[in-house]
UniProtKB/Swiss-Prot annotation:
One of its GO terms (molecular function) is DNA binding. It comes from the Eukaryota. InterPro entries: Protamine_P1. Testis. This is Sperm protamine P1.
Length: 62
């Protein structure tokens, strides 16, 4: 676990410097990373609530 944490902090500092150069590539990957993180943390609490809402919206859309 310690190794993983250290590598993560290092990659963060590197990405901050490359943010201006590869803004498109970073936005795509971040995104993706942010989605994964939000699902793991808030997914458990909002699963029931989000399912009710999405089910109604999907039924109307489709």
């Amino acid at each position: 676990m310690a190794r993983y944490r250290h590598s993560r902090s290092r990659s963060r500092s590197r990405y901050r410097r490359r943010r201006r150069r590869r803004s498109r590539y970073r936005s795509r990957r971040r995104x993706y990373r942010g989605r994964r993180r939000r699902r793991s943390r808030r997914g458990r609490r909002r699963r029931g609530y989000s399912r009710r809402r999405y089910s109604r919206r999907r039924r109307r859309r489709y």
